[in-house]
Amino acid sequence: MMNSRTDRYVVVDLEATSTGRKAKIIQVGIVVIENGEIVDQYGTDINPHEPLDSHIKELTGLTDQRLAVAPEFSQVAGRIFELVKDGVFVAHNVQFDANLLAEYLFFEGYELRTPRVDTVELAQVLYPQFEKYNLGILCQELGIKLDHAHTALSDAQATAELLLFMCQKLFQLPKGLLETLLNLADNLLYETYLVIEEVYQRQSLLSSHDLMEFHGLFLRKKSKSLKPRKLSKDFTKNISLLDLDERPQQVEFAEKVEQLLKEQKIAFIQAQTGLGKTYGYLLPALSMESEGGILVSVPTKILQNQIMQEEGSRLKDTFHIDIHSLKGPQNYLKLDNFYKVLHRPESNRLFTRFKMQVLIWLTETETGDLDEIGQLYRYQHIIPELVHDGKLSKKSLFSSEDFWQRSQDRAKSSRLLLTNHAYLVTRLEDDPEFVNNRLVIIDEAQKMLIALENLAQESYLLDDLVTQVEKSLETEKDLIQRRLLESIGFECRYLIDQFYSCLLYTSDAAD
């Protein structure tokens, strides 16, 4: 490997005729970063000597006519090699760009053996809440300028800004956390760990005012509650304060809700889709004095998360409403479990990267709700080891900061408590007084029946049921009871036979 400087990053983006083995370079963009600043950049078209397909033309804006007068790669290879040879090669999906450029340079007599950093991999670690990590989405989320997507130099400039953005975020982390990340970073693609290593070497020992350390984990301090602002009795004024447009049907719905709330009776009200019913019932409820607070239940966790992100955020920002989302314990990270897993050696690279993501997420979350982590579906085989079971041992290392316990405490004091039907019916079965002294609003109440049906259901293994029936028959003397047991046993065996027949039929059909 060449003697590459880890304080010199060479960010490269290539546009090519395809992403396959026969890909030919049609455009090169290079941005050089030294000591945290962009010091040089270079861009050029490359003549591929073959026509572009319509998809590539549309994607890049390049034409056959433009590339026909572009230089050969051999004419610019020396210039490109001088730029990239003694720095760390950086790209968004570095495998494609580095391998293709190395191949082109090799045929011109240059050997590219620089370390590689993948900004996709690094972004996945540092921004665990994101759902997607393509360059356009990252630039949009982080406010990075990307003037001409899929233009090599523009993409390289955006990737360089992204790298600087991520370095800045790393510098804001405590040195102890950087050390923990660095111990896991060998599992990142190629030499992506070098970015963390450089920041670690330059980072001071100063601690962050927003974080606190517990047994090597860095957790965000609880934010101070702001003094709530009083809502107007006028629905339209509240809508205006939220910077939303007034809608006649929504106003009519809100007035009806307000009238029903004043009557203090159990009431049902139907509203058509799309009129803005969430604000239509929340604002009238919040504008009324209520000692016990408001409990809102919605049909799904997806809708619960959506309301927290949209309506909940606006209400917090505008009126400083203390709103809390409450779910079952299995939705929260149990810090004791993660602590054990963190210190366990892993052979699975993705599992180790997920540990790094969680370490970053812990510095940002106040709830410990795992739904905040994007792409959580990719780690479903890992999650059961980490989730809370609703129990907290007195020997817990994190008893004072346990997310599930914190959620329960907040639920008691929050002005507006948001939950879902499944959790509500389960909670009421164990704690009937949960709704006492609260104004309860059931959104899409007709779907509460589904939650109640699911709660009432029990599951049995048919084989176990047959065994139990046979044991009962050995001792049962009553003739009617024996006939009932025999009938149940017959039906269970029939269902088992049908199941295996279907499996055999499916297998034969697949063959």
PLM regions with names:
Residues 451, 455-504:
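Conserved phosphoryl-transfer catalytic core
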Residues 279-291, 310-313:
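Walker A/P-loop NTP-binding motif
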Residues 263-281:
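Walker A/P-loop
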Residues 2-115, 128-146, 150:
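Conserved non-catalytic scaffold segment of RNase H-like nuclease domains
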Residues 227-268:
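Conserved pre-motif I regulatory segment
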Residues 3, 165-235:
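Acidic two-metal-ion nuclease catalytic site recognized across multiple nuclease folds
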Residues 233-236, 292-293, 298-414:
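A substrate-engagement module of RecA-like helicase motors
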Residues 505-511:
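Conserved small/polar residues in nucleotide/adenosyl-binding loops
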